[in-house]
Amino acid sequence: MKRNNKQTMAIVIILGVFLLTGCSDELPEDELVNNGQAFEMHKITDDLQAGNFPFQNDNGFVTLTQLKDSVKELLGDKYWPEVDLTKEELEQKTGITEDMYVDFLAEKQVLDAHIDTMIIIHAKEAHVGEVEQALEKYRADIIEQNKNYPQNLCKAEASRMETIEDYVCFVQLGADTTIVADKGEDAMIAYCQEENERALYVLEKEILE
């Protein structure tokens, strides 16, 4: 009698194991999908927290600060902007409001009399055109304000605005133009244009590749 009880108990245990295994292997498909989606959402959230409004190129996530650092690395001591603009200062100077962009980076020199500037606006898709117009007007205003200052005027006239995907970039660089000042205004403009082209080359490469 005891042996029969043991055999019965063993059969019950074995059946229980098979039932549990079957339930585990046969989870409803929608539950499996939901579990997978929850994992993916958690992973995406972790990625977004790793950087400040990053965008993704083929090499991974890149922030606007990393874009700036790439330009600084190429230009070296010829990159003079050093003070970040706040969103309020950006709006005051350019008319670009917070609702037009995802993120921005804007740097200028400490003294307003010195005009080396770089602005990168990650524009919202619906506002790319407005941001472009605002920066074109900003550029025209700087040219007008510096008509009586030859070296600054050359930098302003050499400035460039270029749109790369949803990134609207404004570069007004050149650093020390006195090294070509004795060759005339055309030489100073050409010198600054070359520095701006170098900066835009880096930005385009980082954003698109």
Regions picked out by a protein language model, each given a short descriptive name:
Residues 11-16:
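Hydrophobic helical h-region of N-terminal Sec-dependent signal peptides
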Residues 2-10, 121:
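Bacterial N-terminal signal peptides that target proteins for export
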Residues 2-5, 17, 106-107, 155-156:
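A generic local structural motif
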Residues 19-22:
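C-terminal motif of bacterial Sec signal peptides marking the signal peptidase cleavage site
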